[in-house]
Amino acid sequence: MATYLIGDVHGCYDELIALLQQVEFTPDTDTLWLTGDLVARGPGSLDVLRYVKSLGNSVRLVLGNHDLHLLAVFAGISRNKPKDRLTPLLEAPDADELLNWLRRQPLLQVDEEKKLVMAHAGITPQWDLQTAKECARDVEAVLSSDSYPFFLDAMYGDMPNNWSPELSGLARLRFITNAFTRMRYCFPNGQLDMYSKASPENAPAPLKPWFAIPGPVSEAYSIAFGHWASLEGKGTPEGIYALDTGCCWGGELTCLRWEDKQYFVQPSNRQMDMGEGEAVNA
């Protein structure tokens, strides 16, 4: 009964299946955690969604920014870009079923027994766990409602970038979405910086990676996240697990077996190209 945490798949279906075969994943007894960004850039987004959906209760996932962008394309709000390789998914006969399932997935996973939290980009140091749970539910409720296209149309933007319990309406939902799915750097007070994508050693002062700023969640829980492929899984404090290692850019798909903290990797089938940059709202 093992728990396997895997970083951003980004449509790399063949590598996902090979990695699961490598660790001998058994859906009847094991649990798979996925850090989000299931789709886009790799050639197999349709197969990834079909497979992950088929796992039922054996999988725990969170939505990433690319998953939200896919939903915006599906809703007719955003443009389908060829580089995202989403057309086979959008034109599939079961597209409606898959994407209506996807929009009902969470932004946050918490296992109290393991003291483990997972979100696509991480947890802002401005939140305690109760606030994070409440904020996740706010966005999840809108995404699972009939008014979800209205939210998706309004989610794009970098402001507000500072948390306040007084935030309301679309401003509140946009901050929550950015914190869970786009965050990398923060100012020392926890305010989000949505612009810098430099490596941590080259980040302009006073910015710090979100995980370098102590917060209530990181002090009490381990945190698993994806999103930040250029970290290559390195440079995080103890108990913080960066799992996106750039499979869709030619890197690797990384798996962490939680029980013994052993890592497994599956090399990408693509040539290394970390210079492509990350897609919309990355």
Curated annotation (Swiss-Prot):
Keywords: Hydrolase. It catalyses: P(1),P(4)-bis(5'-adenosyl) tetraphosphate + H2O = 2 ADP + 2 H(+). It comes from Salmonella typhimurium (strain LT2 / SGSC1412 / ATCC 700720). GO terms for biological process: RNA decapping. This is Bis(5'-nucleosyl)-tetraphosphatase, symmetrical. GO terms for cellular component: cytoplasm. Hydrolyzes diadenosine 5',5'''-P1,P4-tetraphosphate to yield ADP. GO terms for molecular function: bis(5'-nucleosyl)-tetraphosphatase (symmetrical) activity; phosphatase activity. Its EC number is 3.6.1.41. Belongs to the Ap4A hydrolase family. It comes from the Bacteria.
